[in-house]
């Protein structure tokens, strides 16, 4: 399935939640204090950035969406700095000022791109303050398509059920970045986006992929959510809805410098995409890519449309689906079979994807409902093909394959043959390209023994990765 960015400028979003100011003091450190065993930092840079719900709003604005921001602030200089910070990018602040409370501030001291300490300046807001904020925000619902509740457990979002119900009654989607052990507070929300720790704090320890899906569906039913997107760090994201198969989206982050604000980026990209007309799976793929960009930056950051376009092209070959872990695939395959779908599987190196590959995979997909492509990892290709191979690393090979309309799932394997992974997955039909004899196809006997079939498909003559490489070398 292809992913294309919608017209973000059409998105109209209201963000309600805990706003704060992220303040950074930055400088070199070259000695230890004589007063205590701590480093001395000579501050040469001070920077303020909107954080929390304000960072969500900035992310939406940076992508090109129209956004209003409602939150609780104090009557202080920090509130003024926060106002200037959001207005710079065209965010409309709708503050409720609480005179006897400070605007929440997170002060971080950094040196050599490392955070040394964080100091928090805050007092919890009262329940009455939250009631007033949500009541004030009701007047904004008629001018937006999506609402984001950004809850950092600081008091702005206390009991939002009535607000959620009113928004849904008006046809407005409500997305929630939740906190705490009671997701019932958000009953009726369109989508909640807990990270794995937040999810397990509510449902208990997750022991397997199947257990995660069972627990997520339990929450959907219990609290009348339309969907749950669990963000899982290096395992990517898992989207669970009531009436569709689950969707696993692998992480795209190559280097992680700072996870500050990553959750904000996810929900802001989701909100902007959905408000601009994207469907939920596409919005999740866009959000996953945006998160992969932002964790490669230091401190609370935003992601621009240009960065998102570049990241989608680099990491997905324009596709947000397909690449899964073996465990994720095993469960997805089980569910596909329960739905009566015929699953076809093939394998190969696919080092340089060419017309012969595309034709072959199209033929394979035509034989069933779902197509799995198992791909040799880099070490396996090198053992099979020799020095100088693979030309393309496995993540890029898989990303390109996942971009093909004929391919549903792509999974890597490390052995020289796919015998083990085929034996584990046992597709309905195993196909192989070339002039193989059926009895020589790895995993074929096991598939047949399990009631499946094995079939050989022809390749287009004269097209091969080796021939392409030799032709390139000859013309250098």
Curated annotation (Swiss-Prot):
SUPFAM superfamilies: Nucleotidylyl transferase (SSF52374), Ribokinase-like (SSF53613). It is an enzyme of class 2 (transferase). It comes from the Bacteria. The keyword Phosphoprotein does not apply. One of its GO terms (molecular function) is heptose-1-phosphate adenylyltransferase activity. Its EC number is 2.7.1.167, 2.7.7.70. Keywords: ATP-binding, Carbohydrate metabolism, Kinase, Multifunctional enzyme, Nucleotide-binding, Nucleotidyltransferase, Transferase. One of its GO terms (biological process) is ADP-L-glycero-beta-D-manno-heptose biosynthetic process. The active site is at 264. Pfam families: CTP_transf_like, PfkB. PANTHER family: BIFUNCTIONAL PROTEIN HLDE. Catalyzes the ADP transfer from ATP to D-glycero-beta-D-manno-heptose 1-phosphate, yielding ADP-D-glycero-beta-D-manno-heptose. Homodimer. This is Bifunctional protein HldE. It comes from Shewanella baltica (strain OS223). The gene is hldE.
């Amino acid at each position: 399935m292809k992913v294309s960015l919608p017209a973000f400028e059409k998105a109209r979003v209201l963000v309600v939640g805990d706003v704060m100011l992220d303040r950074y003091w930055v400088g070199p450190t070259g000695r230890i204090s004589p007063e205590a065993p701590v480093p001395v930092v000579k501050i040469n840079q001070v920077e303020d950035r909107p954080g929390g719900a304000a960072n969500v709003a900035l992310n939406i604005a940076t992508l090109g969406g129209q956004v209003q921001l409602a939150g609780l602030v104090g009557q202080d200089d920090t509130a003024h700095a926060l106002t200037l910070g959001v207005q710079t990018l065209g965010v409309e602040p709708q503050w409720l000022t609480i005179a006897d409370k400070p605007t929440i501030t997170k002060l971080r001291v950094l040196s050599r791109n490392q955070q040394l300490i964080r100091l928090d300046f805050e007092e919890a807001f009262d329940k009455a303050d939250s009631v007033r904020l949500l009541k004030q925000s009701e007047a904004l619902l008629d001018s937006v398509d999506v609402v984001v509740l950004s809850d950092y457990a600081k008091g702005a979002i206390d009991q939002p059920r009535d607000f959620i119900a009113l928004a849904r009654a008006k046809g407005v989607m409500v997305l929630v970045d939740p906190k705490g052990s009671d997701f019932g507070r958000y009953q009726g929300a369109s989508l909640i986006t807990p990270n794995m720790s937040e999810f397990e704090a509510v449902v208990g320890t997750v022991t397997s992929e199947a257990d995660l899906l069972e627990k997520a569906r339990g929450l959907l039913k219990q609290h009348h959510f339309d969907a749950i997107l669990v963000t899982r760090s290096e395992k990517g994201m898992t989207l669970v809805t009531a009436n569709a198969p689950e969707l696993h989206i692998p992480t795209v982050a190559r280097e992680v410098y700072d996870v500050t604000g990553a959750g904000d980026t996810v929900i802001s990209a989701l909100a902007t995409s959905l408000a601009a007309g994207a469907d939920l799976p596409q919005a999740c793929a866009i959000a996953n890519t945006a998160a992969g960009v932002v964790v490669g930056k230091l401190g609370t950051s935003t992601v621009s449309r240009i960065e998102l376009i570049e990241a989608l092209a680099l990491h997905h070959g324009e596709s947000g689906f397909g690449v899964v872990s073996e465990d994720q695939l095993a469960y997805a395959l089980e569910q596909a079979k329960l739905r009566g779908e015929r699953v076809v599987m093939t394998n190969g190196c696919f080092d340089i994807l060419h017309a012969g590959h595309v034709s072959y995979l199209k033929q394979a997909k035509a034989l069933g409902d779902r197509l799995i492509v198992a791909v040799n990892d880099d070490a396996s290709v090198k053992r099979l093909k020799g020095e100088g191979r693979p030309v393309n690393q496995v993540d890029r090979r898989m990303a390109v394959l996942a971009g093909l309309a004929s391919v549903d799932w792509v999974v890597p394997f490390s052995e020289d043959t796919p015998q083990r992974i085929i034996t584990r997955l046992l597709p309905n039909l195993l196909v192989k390209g070339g002039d193989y004899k059926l009895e020589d196809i790895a995993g074929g006997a096991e598939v047949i023994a399990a009631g499946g079939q094995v079939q050989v498909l022809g390749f287009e003559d004269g097209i091969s990765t080796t021939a392409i490489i030799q032709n390139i070398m000859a013309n250098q």
